């Protein structure tokens, strides 16, 4: 290879690597708004919902494995509300046991893997809850728009698998399998936006 060809190759390689770095960086997102809804079916029929909007985290497309998503989502279980104050206290203190520390006060979803990054898809991940870590799987709809990504996801969990005491309220129990719904909007990380403007 001639000196000129080597120079062209080095310049071209540097340019491609720079573009790749920007692409990876632009795939970093922070959570701009989110809501988690836990649907709890009752043993006697019907259900109630526990909700919170206290969700934060940062996610990014995994560079090492296609379909993987780095980062994590963290949900503040201390802010879950069902609409009945005494039931909220029972749920947080007697069952989720949020007073035991961060591993109980927060739930974390991490190591996400999706079939595709646009449209309806399936996903798997790890849920850290009540001091336990278990694999989860569910469905999601990802909608990129104007630089943002809206995500609506749903997955089931079994309360007993996380060693949570069997929930009862006024003699009525909650079924072992409950549904978790997550809706969020992710935007490019603020640090990355600032970096691009420099």
What does each model-found stretch correspond to?
Residues 1-12:
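Bacterial N-terminal signal peptides that target proteins for export
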Residues 24-198:
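Low-complexity, acidic/polar, glycine-enriched regions of mature
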Residues 3-4, 18, 22-26:
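Extreme N-terminus of proteins, especially the signal/transit-peptide cleavage junction
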Residues 10-20:
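Bacterial N-terminal signal peptides
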